[in-house]
Swiss-Prot record:
The protein, known as: Tyrosine--tRNA ligase
Lineage: Bacteria, Pseudomonadati, Pseudomonadota, Gammaproteobacteria, Pasteurellales
Principal subcellular localisation of the protein: cytoplasm
Chain ranges for the short sequence motif 'KMSKS' region as given in the UniProt record: 226-230
Keywords, sorted A to Z: Aminoacyl-tRNA synthetase, ATP-binding, Cytoplasm, Ligase, Nucleotide-binding, Protein biosynthesis, RNA-binding
InterPro entries, alphabetized: aa-tRNA-synth_I_CS, aa-tRNA-synth_Ic, Rossmann-like_a/b/a_fold, S4_RNA-bd, S4_RNA-bd_sf, Tyr-tRNA-ligase, Tyr-tRNA-ligase_bac-type, Tyr-tRNA-ligase_bac_2
E.C. no: 6.1.1.1
Protein's organism: Pasteurella multocida (strain Pm70)
Length: 395
């Protein structure tokens, strides 16, 4: 039991909820490789740091000798997961889904051991359900139970449309667990309802219900919303070391500690020590550098991490980037010149255009050459001349 308690303590690190912990302990006592499932719909071409929170936990199960299944939702991706959405997500074409799935397959191996990872596509069984099978599946849940889900409840109360296929989505994801006879399923906190549907469907199928483990959602570069490619507040795991370093350094000091909790492999005692050092006067930028280097070393190499730090020093610190630079947020895409004016970095749009022509404007350290550049959803550090800086989020 002591060994199980040790493993359990490691598995609980960074976890939001285990449903149920007693079930997990019973499964661990069986002393066999457990089937641990993580599903992802390839709705965008790249995996970002937000995805790695659950992937890191999957990797941990892998290290403890369990059977890891990474499920690519090539079927459910064409339906569209309504979790956390206040509008219907437009379904993707099969070509889009398969194209994105290829990059997922490549990028997960930056985190998971390819020799110990089983990749499956849920079209293998969902595509074979047919009309009769779909009717049997949907008979397991009522509309009333579906409306217990927060996002559906809010949309129904606000008279916002809910498409029938959105009700079906949790059942399809739950059926994945039946098809795989999963022991454990991982997901973000926004997936809790779907994971619990899987437990119910497994009971109906005569299987032991899976343990549902939810993990917190990583807040993106803007410091407000969950990391998402559509919001532009993300860092992709395939981005260059230089891009990664600059983006990590752009996050707020408060957000940095959340990222340490969810992304760092450092012992909790070491993270607590770093917090104490900051409270005692150490510059938070030093601690942010450590996080940036840890992530770059993980997804690239230690040599890349060192080189990215040096390039950052050459670009920014030698340009005396202020520690207390203003942070601003604007709604809707806008032209670069207007953004610089609204951010207080120039007096007028004509001055902004002139500074761009003279090579005096940089975004995340990269010189801008197009004065007519349109800035879409993103978070970046804008520099005008050698002394004017602002961290700007465009939503």
């Amino acid at each position: 039991m002591t060994e199980i308690n040790t493993v359990l303590a490691e598995l609980k690190r960074g976890v939001d909820e285990i449903l149920s912990e007693a079930d997990l302990i019973e499964k661990l006592k069986e002393n066999r490789p457990l089937r641990v499932k993580l599903g992802a719909d390839p709705t965008a071409p790249d995996i970002h740091l937000g995805h790695t929170v659950v992937l890191n936990k999957l990797r941990q199960f892998q290290q403890f000798g369990h059977e890891v299944i990474f499920l690519i939702g090539d079927f459910t991706g064409m339906v569209g997961d309504p979790s956390g959405k206040n509008t219907t997500r437009p379904p993707l074409s099969r070509d889009d889904v398969l194209r994105n799935a290829e990059t997922y397959k490549q990028q997960i191996y930056k985190i998971l051991d390819p020799q110990k990872t089983r990749i499956v596509f849920n079209s293998s069984w969902l595509g074979e359900l047919g009309t009769e099978g779909m009717i049997r599946l949907t008979s397991n849940y009522t509309v009333a139970r579906m409306l217990e889900r927060d996002d559906f409840k809010k949309r129904f109360s606000n008279n916002q449309p809910i498409a029938i296929h959105e009700f079906i989505y949790p059942l399809l994801q739950g059926y994945d667990s039946v098809a795989l006879d999963a022991d454990i399923e991982l997901g973000g906190t926004d997936q809790k309802f779907n994971l619990l549907v899987g437990r119910e469907l497994q009971k109906s199928a005569g299987q032991k219900p899976q343990v549902a483990i939810t993990l917190p959602l990583l807040v993106g570069l803007d410091g407000e919303k969950k990391m998402s490619k559509s919001l532009g507040n993300y860092i992709g795991v395939a981005e260059s070391p230089t891009e990664m370093f600059g983006k990590v350094m752009s996050i707020s000091d408060e957000l940095m500690w959340d990222w340490y909790d969810l992304l760092s492999f450092r012992p909790l005692t070491e993270i607590a020590q770093l917090k104490q050092e900051v409270e005692n006067g150490r510059n938070p930028r030093d601690i942010k550098v450590l996080l940036a280097k840890e992530l770059i070393a993980r997804f690239h190499s230690e040599a890349d991490a060192e080189a990215a730090e040096q390039e950052f020093i050459n670009r920014f610190q030698k340009g005396a980037m202020p520690e207390d630079m203003p942070e601003l947020t604007f709604e809707g895409e806008m032209g670069l010149a207007n953004l610089l004016k609204e951010a207080g970095l120039v007096a007028s749009t004509s001055e902004a255009n002139r500074m761009v022509q003279q090579g005096g404007v940089k975004i995340d350290g990269e010189k801008v050459e197009d004065a007519k550049l349109v800035i879409k959803a993103s978070t970046a550090v804008y520099q005008v001349g050698k002394r004017k800086f602002a961290r700007v989020t465009v939503k």
